[in-house]
């Protein structure tokens, strides 16, 4: 079995909606393979939301004008194409814009329903004079990529409904480059740098995660042809390797009190991995292993970033009965001659 070093992915935020992602080290050639796939997926396949059609009060078609409005309908449509929205609704959703002049009309004047959010409230849509009045019904749908107005036009749609081009993609720009990087004595490994800029409706981090999920699903189709086919296995991450090392440690490394240590040993628990596979209820079933011992174990595990099976997160060691550091604290290996000296089988907490 061939095992490659696991690459790391690090995000370097440049601004709120632009980040640079560095993936390294990659086997020679994989930088361009991943970079091209990620770029194409980010630009074309990230789900988003957009306005698909509008209906303006008193307007029958897109070549009309609206009394009291400086912009004609064509200009209004061009401005609405710049609107940045997000939607949690799978079905088409309607939102409304109603404004009386004089003054400017911006995206902040739109009243979105529940599940829809306007992310570009400062976008200028139109200008009204003293007698100007604008009422627009906007239909928002979810999708991906680009859909033309002709494709958005539905058979038998109502008179006055104007379909518009929809740009669903929340990603504005993606570039990548591949550099050489060194691993031990080899200098031909790849470092992939992907620069992602998005609209305010999604963060670059979420866009990158979405692209990765899509690619994993698609490449998984090839793996299904033969699940046992040999490939290059990716080694464990540094965090996984450190966790595996901690789990393999003997419980002697926890520096427990004599009573807790002896109880665990008699139960056949020899490593930290075996210990964290037990729940509090399992440990309380051990004879002479009471709540003080539970608190001690949880405190020691918490210092290592671990916890017992099914334990709720957020254990506060200060809530435990604090006997550590006092005269009654007796680490199991502080003095071998005292091992078990104070351990009484029948004593209960």
Curated annotation (Swiss-Prot):
Entries under SMART domains matching the protein: RPOLD
Cystines in this chain: none
Region described as Disordered: spans on this chain: 308-349
The keyword Transferase belongs to this UniProt entry's keyword annotation: yes
Entry's EC annotation: 2.7.7.6
Compositionally biased region (Acidic residues): 336-349
SUPFAM superfamilies named among the record's database cross-references: C-terminal domain of RNA polymerase alpha subunit, Insert subdomain of RNA polymerase alpha subunit, RBP11-like subunits of RNA polymerase
Region annotation (Alpha C-terminal domain (alpha-CTD)) ranges: 241-349
Keyword annotations from UniProtKB, A to Z: DNA-directed RNA polymerase, Nucleotidyltransferase, Transcription, Transferase
GO CC terms of this entry: cytoplasm; DNA-directed RNA polymerase complex
Domain free text: The N-terminal domain is essential for RNAP assembly and basal transcription, whereas the C-terminal domain is involved in interaction with transcriptional regulators and with upstream promoter elements.
Protein name per Swiss-Prot or TrEMBL: DNA-directed RNA polymerase subunit alpha
Organism expressing this protein natively: Frankia alni (strain DSM 45986 / CECT 9034 / ACN14a)
């Amino acid at each position: 079995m061939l095992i490659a070093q696991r690459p790391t992915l690090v995000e370097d935020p440049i601004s709120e909606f632009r980040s640079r992602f560095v993936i390294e080290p990659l086997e020679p050639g994989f930088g361009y393979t991943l970079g091209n796939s990620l770029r194409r997926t980010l630009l074309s396949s990230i789900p988003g939301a957009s306005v698909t059609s509008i209906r303006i009060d008193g307007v029958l078609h897109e070549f009309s004008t609206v009394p009291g409005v400086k912009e004609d309908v064509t200009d209004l449509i061009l401005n609405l194409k710049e609107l940045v929205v997000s939607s949690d609704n799978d079905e088409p959703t309607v939102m409304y814009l109603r404004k009386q002049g004089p003054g400017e009309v911006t995206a902040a004047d739109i009243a979105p329903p529940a599940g829809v959010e306007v992310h570009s409230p400062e976008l200028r849509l139109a200008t009204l004079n003293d007698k100007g009045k604008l009422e627009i019904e906007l239909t928002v749908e979810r999708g991906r990529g680009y859909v033309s107005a002709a494709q958005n036009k539905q058979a038998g749609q109502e008179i006055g409904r104007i379909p518009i081009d929809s740009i669903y993609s929340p990603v504005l720009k993606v570039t990548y480059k591949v550099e050489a990087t060194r691993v031990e004595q080899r200098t031909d490994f790849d470092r992939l740098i992907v620069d992602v800029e998005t609209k305010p409706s999604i963060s670059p981090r979420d866009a990158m995660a979405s692209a990765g999920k899509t690619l994993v699903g698609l490449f998984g189709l090839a793996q299904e042809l033969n699940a046992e086919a040999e490939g290059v296995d990716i080694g464990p991450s540094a965090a996984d390797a450190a966790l595996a090392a901690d789990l393999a440690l003997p419980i002697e490394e926890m520096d427990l009190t004599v009573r807790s240590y002896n109880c665990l040993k008699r139960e056949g628990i020899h490593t930290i991995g075996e210990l964290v596979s037990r729940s509090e209820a399992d440990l309380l079933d051990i004879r002479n292993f009471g709540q003080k011992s539970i608190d001690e174990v949880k405190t020691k595990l918490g210092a290592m970033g671990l916890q017992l099976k099914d334990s709720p997160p957020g254990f506060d060691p200060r809530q435990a009965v604090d006997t550590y550091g006092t005269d009654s604290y007796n680490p199991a290996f502080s003095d071998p001659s005292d091992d078990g000296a104070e351990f009484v089988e029948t004593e209960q907490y």
